[in-house]
């Protein structure tokens, strides 16, 4: 829209044009009161993105305050581009997770690709070199042609961006449920390494210092992307394809290297990614955090399209752009560095002392707004909360143990379920070995990367079983954190901290807001008990399509520290003759389980219980045993229960088997009782291990016959399956489903 065609201030108010930008009548009245006048078109556009849920967290701020954010190792908590945790020796790990859900539903390749690009920029804007990317993905049932298309394109987008930029994509999770049919979830996590002295903040300090724009030119892609991400999906969402950004990983690679070089210069005062809301959020947030203001001349903004208006320039979410604040008089040093990488670096403004964002275009001031009103003073809503009727019903519903007539066939069917099946089809498209630091590749409980020049390594994972959260958000929230920590411990690492991605439906619906509140309560309690503070994250609400919400899906990203690479552990059995233990009791808990979905086609009932004190005790004991050199392999028991955990432990290049004896009914093989592990131990270490891990029960032995044999204590054979048969079912499921015609 040309400046001449933009509506007047009076038109904006009288015709309520602000509503099209997601601004309510009450919010418009607040804006008018703050300014003491009517906003113009550029100004209301700026307010609309800064006050969107995506940027302001106006519906979720009261919830986020519940999370523990401090800890002995925490160097930077929520509020910056990414959180930072000390790992000793003057080093720190930087990590964060973010969503790109709505864009990926409309334009899956670019939506996923730019999600990866954005989270990488958040990490290197802190001064860290990104070392790994993970992702947590949710789709509808893989029998749907539309879902197959979204799945293939999202994975291709992640691979296309990550592989080109040279950062390994090392892990994550993919789950499939009907509720994600119209609203897939694409959450990307990035992990980086930094020395303490290189930590940078996104702050515009120093009156008179230069504001510099670096990176790609600004186009019209992604305008109102932040607003789009704060709405429900509908049949009309397809029309908002222009709100999806377009990425260039080769440009990002150059930008990454240039920024890491600039960070070494003391001429750099502050740096921030132009992410959601682009130039608007980066300038307003950097000024607000520093207690300063910013003036910019928009005529100087590098543009790849002609005739762009101030509104378009400020709201564009074109990718691969950063905003820097440089010491006055030292601009050329920075320009020279970016020039070396063939990147533009342009002085576009300066820092002021009056806490105002002033924008000039063609010699005229086109916006004058208080930065704190934009960045810190968005309205905060305490939404009404209501217990859903379905939850009350589930509490009263008895869930009978499913009848398992043939345990072997049931196991094979479970291994073919897309949520359980091997994700090799996915990660084979990712370059997970680039930079050669990946020690444990995708396919185990957590990915592990060594830290060069030390004996240390980092373990990383993403986790969330949304079915449990649907049944009981508070219990499910606890389980999400506990399972992430379990996966970290099974790799030989001590859990350090959490980054969370809260994916929920429309918070204006009281039943949905109740889910958000309860899930946050569960996550907070688990983080407190397990000593894993929340150092940052993302909130993605309005994940609904045509009025139907996704399951509550607060994805937990977690990083752990391995002090000595000799302690690195994987889930695969290592040698015939090793003893197999299960840590933890098994109860008939099938609500929300893969077996329940397989046999009944739906999930219902009371979520599996979790005792966080027991969870912590078992994790500590297992980690101590691993660090003492007593454990050959460790695998957490999750979807599909002990049966699936045993199958996954025998499926490895060594083609080992396992002979196991269990108590109870065959269905218990597939119960999803929490806080359990499958562990293998050398016979020489039996006494020491049992002394250390009190909750461990000896259930069998690793064998060389490539057979998984499971029998009852009375000697009744439940399962006798060749490892090759299990592997074929597990590895072949997703490729087979993708080839099939619906």
From Swiss-Prot:
GO annotation (BP), single: 'de novo' IMP biosynthetic process
Compartment(s) of residence: Cytoplasm
KW Signal (keyword) present: no
InterPro entries hit by this protein: PRibForGlyAmidine_synth_PurL, PurL_linker, PurM-like_C_dom, PurM-like_C_sf, PurM-like_N, PurM-like_N_sf
Record's keyword terms, sorted: ATP-binding, Cytoplasm, Ligase, Magnesium, Metal-binding, Nucleotide-binding, Purine biosynthesis
Entry binding sites for substrate: 99-102, 121, 245, 317-319, 540
A cellular component term, taken from the record's GO annotations: cytoplasm
Active site (record annotation): 54, 100
Pfam families in UniProt: AIRS, AIRS_C, FGAR-AT_linker
Binding site for ATP: 57, 96, 500, 537
CDD domains: PurL_repeat1 (cd02203), PurL_repeat2 (cd02204)
SUPFAM superfamilies: PurM C-terminal domain-like, PurM N-terminal domain-like
Reaction equations catalysed: N(2)-formyl-N(1)-(5-phospho-beta-D-ribosyl)glycinamide + L-glutamine + ATP + H2O = 2-formamido-N(1)-(5-O-phospho-beta-D-ribosyl)acetamidine + L-glutamate + ADP + phosphate + H(+)
UniProt EC number: 6.3.5.3
Pathway as given in its UniProt record: Purine metabolism; IMP biosynthesis via de novo pathway; 5-amino-1-(5-phospho-D-ribosyl)imidazole from N(2)-formyl-N(1)-(5-phospho-D-ribosyl)glycinamide: step 1/2
Binding site for Mg(2+) 2: 122, 273
Binding positions for Mg(2+) 1 per the UniProt entry: 98, 538
Molecular function in Gene Ontology: ATP binding; magnesium ion binding; phosphoribosylformylglycinamidine synthase activity
Assembly with partners or alone: Monomer. Part of the FGAM synthase complex composed of 1 PurL, 1 PurQ and 2 PurS subunits.
Function of the molecule: Part of the phosphoribosylformylglycinamidine synthase complex involved in the purines biosynthetic pathway. Catalyzes the ATP-dependent conversion of formylglycinamide ribonucleotide (FGAR) and glutamine to yield formylglycinamidine ribonucleotide (FGAM) and glutamate. The FGAM synthase complex is composed of three subunits. PurQ produces an ammonia molecule by converting glutamine to glutamate. PurL transfers the ammonia molecule to FGAR to form FGAM in an ATP-dependent manner.
Assigned protein family: Belongs to the FGAMS family.
Protein's UniProt name: Phosphoribosylformylglycinamidine synthase subunit PurL
Species this chain originates from: Bacillus licheniformis (strain ATCC 14580 / DSM 13 / JCM 2505 / CCUG 7422 / NBRC 12200 / NCIMB 9375 / NCTC 10341 / NRRL NRS-1264 / Gibson 46)
Lineage: Bacteria, Bacillati, Bacillota, Bacilli, Bacillales
Gene encoding the protein: purL
């Amino acid at each position: 829209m040309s400046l001449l065609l933009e509506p007047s201030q009076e038109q904006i108010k009288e015709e309520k044009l602000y509503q099209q930008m997601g601004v309510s009548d009450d919010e418009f009245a607040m804006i008018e009161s703050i300014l003491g006048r009517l906003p113009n078109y550029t100004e209301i556009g700026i307010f609309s993105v800064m006050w969107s849920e995506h940027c302001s967290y106006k519906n979720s701020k009261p919830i986020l305050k519940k999370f523990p954010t401090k800890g002995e190792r925490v160097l930077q908590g929520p509020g910056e581009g990414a959180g930072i945790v000390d790992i000793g020796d003057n080093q720190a790990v930087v990590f964060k997770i973010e969503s790109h859900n709505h864009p990926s539903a409309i334009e899956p390749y670019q939506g996923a690709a730019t999600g990866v690009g954005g989270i990488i920029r958040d990490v290197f804007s802190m001064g860290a070199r990104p070392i790994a990317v993970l992702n947590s993905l949710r789709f509808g049932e893989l029998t749907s042609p539309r879902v197959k298309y979204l799945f293939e394109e999202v994975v291709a987008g992640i691979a296309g961006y990550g592989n080109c930029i040279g950062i390994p994509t090392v892990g994550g999770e993919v789950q499939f449920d009907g509720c994600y049919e119209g609203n897939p979830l694409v959450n990307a996590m990035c992990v980086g390494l930094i020395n303490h002295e290189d930590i940078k903040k996104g702050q515009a300090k120093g009156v008179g210092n230069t504001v510099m724009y670096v990176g790609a030119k600004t186009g019209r892609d992604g305008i109102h992307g932040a607003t789009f991400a704060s709405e429900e999906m509908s049949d009309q969402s397809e029309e908002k394809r222009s709100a999806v950004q377009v990425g260039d990983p080769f440009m990002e690679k150059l930008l990454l290297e240039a920024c890491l070089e600039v960070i070494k210069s003391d001429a750099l005062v502050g740096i921030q990614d132009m992410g959601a809301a682009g130039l608007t959020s980066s300038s307003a947030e950097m000024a607000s955090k520093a207690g300063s203001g910013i003036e910019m001349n928009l005529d100087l903004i590098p543009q790849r399209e002609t005739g762009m208006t101030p509104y378009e320039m400020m709201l564009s979410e074109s990718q691969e752009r950063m905003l820097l604040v440089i010491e006055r008089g030292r601009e050329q040093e920075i320009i020279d560095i970016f020039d070396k990488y063939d990147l533009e670096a342009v002085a576009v403004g300066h820092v002021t002392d009056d806490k105002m964002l002033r924008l000039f275009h063609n010699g005229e001031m086109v916006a004058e707004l208080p930065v704190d009103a934009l960045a810190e003073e968005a309205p905060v809503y305490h939404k009404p909360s209501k217990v859903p009727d379905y939850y009350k019903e589930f509490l009263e519903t008895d869930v009978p143990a499913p009848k398992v007539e043939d345990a072997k066939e049931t196991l094979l069917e479970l291994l073919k379920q897309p949520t359980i099946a091997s994700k090799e089809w996915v990660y084979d498209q990712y370059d997970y070995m680039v930079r050669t630091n990946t020690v444990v590749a995708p396919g185990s409980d957590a990915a592990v990367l060594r830290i060069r020049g030390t004996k240390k390594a980092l373990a990383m994972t993403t986790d969330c079983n949304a079915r449990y959260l649907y049944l009981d958000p508070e219990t499910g929230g606890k389980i999400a954190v506990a399972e992430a920590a379990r996966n970290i411990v099974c790799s030989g690492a001590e859990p350090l901290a959490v980054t969370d991605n809260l994916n929920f439906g429309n918070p204006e619906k009281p039943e949905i807001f109740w889910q958000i509140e309860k899930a946050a309560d569960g996550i907070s309690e688990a983080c407190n008990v397990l000593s894993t503070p929340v150092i940052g994250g993302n909130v993605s609400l309005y994940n609904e399509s045509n009025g139907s919400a996704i399951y509550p899906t607060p994805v937990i990203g977690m990083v752990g520290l391995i002090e000595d690479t000799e302690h690195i552990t994987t889930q695969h059995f290592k040698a015939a003759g090793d003893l197999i233990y299960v840590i933890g009791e098994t109860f008939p808990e099938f609500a929300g389980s893969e077996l329940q979905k397989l046999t009944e086609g739906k999930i219902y009932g009371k979520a599996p219980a979790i005792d966080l004190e027991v969870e912590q005790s078992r994790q500590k004991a297992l980690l101590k045993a691993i660090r003492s050199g007593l454990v050959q392999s460790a695998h957490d028991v999750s979807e599909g229960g002990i049966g699936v955990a045993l199958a996954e432990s025998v499926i490895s290049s060594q083609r080992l088997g396992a002979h196991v004896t269990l108590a109870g009914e065959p269905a218990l093989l597939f119960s999803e009782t929490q806080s359990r592990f499958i562990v293998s131990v050398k016979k020489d270490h039996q006494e020491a291990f049992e002394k250390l891990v009190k909750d461990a029960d000896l259930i069998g032995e690793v064998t060389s016959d490539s057979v998984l044999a499971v029998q009852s204590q009375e000697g009744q054979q439940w399962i006798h399956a060749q490892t090759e048969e299990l592997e074929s079912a597990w590895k072949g499921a997703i490729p087979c489903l993708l080839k099939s015609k619906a």
